[in-house]
């Protein structure tokens, strides 16, 4: 696929269809988690339902990073400026790490208060924190996946991320009952198991995307100079991503 030369209607099909399928499986991900939470107890289901608005902070950040990384790297590819392509790629990774640390600190410190503001009982709050704390500890994997994928997406490769979402979805289905109810030497974790299953699935996604990116021809041109932070790239990424993150939140 050549984004600069191929027929536009064909490009739209090649890009949009895999992305749409990936989004479908991402939505099914949450439906599966909700189903298994209902198998634990009504309180666990309530806790998970009230966790989603908090968890959505990570989703919003991921979308913001995706849009910023894809658009800025894509524009640089269109300009045939390989220096900017690699600079934006390294800076979007650094930016993603910084955002994930900020989100983790916020979530771990304020999730309990958010549950209380939503009128949750002590039991629902405690169950919700068991889930959200795991998610926030692993937020770096959620955001790093989309940071790395921004290069692939900008090049027109939406199939890799689609395939990763599908595989992680089925991995999540397998892990959920094992970690929630226990199996052989694995203890029953309850609602915490849903968080652990999600985290393992995201770690799996991160490893697959990382391997794919490391095989990319552009990565061979990376030198230590591209890892020296430059304000202009951070500024452009910030102003591309932050309005999206704020509007979604």
Question: Where do the protein language model's features map onto the residues?
Answer:
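Alpha-helical transmembrane segments of multi-pass membrane transporters/permeases
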Residues: 96, 152-178, 192-195, 199
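Small-residue-rich hydrophobic transmembrane alpha-helices
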Residues: 45-105, 142-161
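Cytoplasmic helix-loop-helix junction between adjacent transmembrane helices
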Residues: 120-121, 125-128, 132, 139-166
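Hydrophobic transmembrane alpha-helices of multi-pass small-molecule transporters
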Residues: 57-60, 172-176, 206-210
């Amino acid at each position: 696929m050549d984004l600069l030369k191929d027929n536009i209607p064909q490009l739209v099909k090649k890009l949009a269809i895999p992305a749409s399928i990936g989004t479908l499986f991402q939505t099914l991900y949450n439906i599966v988690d909700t189903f298994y939470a209902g198998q634990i107890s009504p309180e666990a289901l309530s806790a998970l339902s009230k966790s989603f608005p908090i968890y959505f902070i990570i989703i919003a950040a991921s979308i913001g990073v995706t849009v910023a990384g894809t658009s800025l790297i894509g524009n640089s590819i269109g300009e045939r400026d390989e220096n900017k392509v690699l600079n934006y790629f390294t800076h979007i990774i650094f930016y993603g790490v910084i955002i994930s640390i900020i989100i983790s600190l916020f979530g771990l410190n304020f999730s309990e208060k958010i549950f209380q503001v939503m009128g949750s009982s002590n039991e629902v709050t405690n169950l919700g924190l068991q889930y959200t704390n795991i998610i926030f500890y692993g937020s770096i994997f959620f955001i790093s996946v989309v940071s790395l994928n921004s290069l692939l997406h900008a090049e027109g490769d939406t199939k890799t991320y689609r395939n990763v979402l599908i595989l992680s979805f089925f991995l999540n289905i397998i892990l959920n009952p094992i970690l929630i109810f226990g199996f052989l030497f694995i203890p029953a974790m309850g609602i915490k198991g849903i968080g652990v299953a999600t985290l393992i699935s995201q770690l799996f996604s991160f490893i697959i995307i990382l391997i794919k990116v490391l095989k990319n021809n552009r990565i061979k041109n990376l030198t230590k100079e591209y890892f020296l932070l430059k304000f202009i790239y951070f500024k452009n990424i910030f102003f591309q991503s932050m309005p999206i993150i704020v509007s979604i939140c």
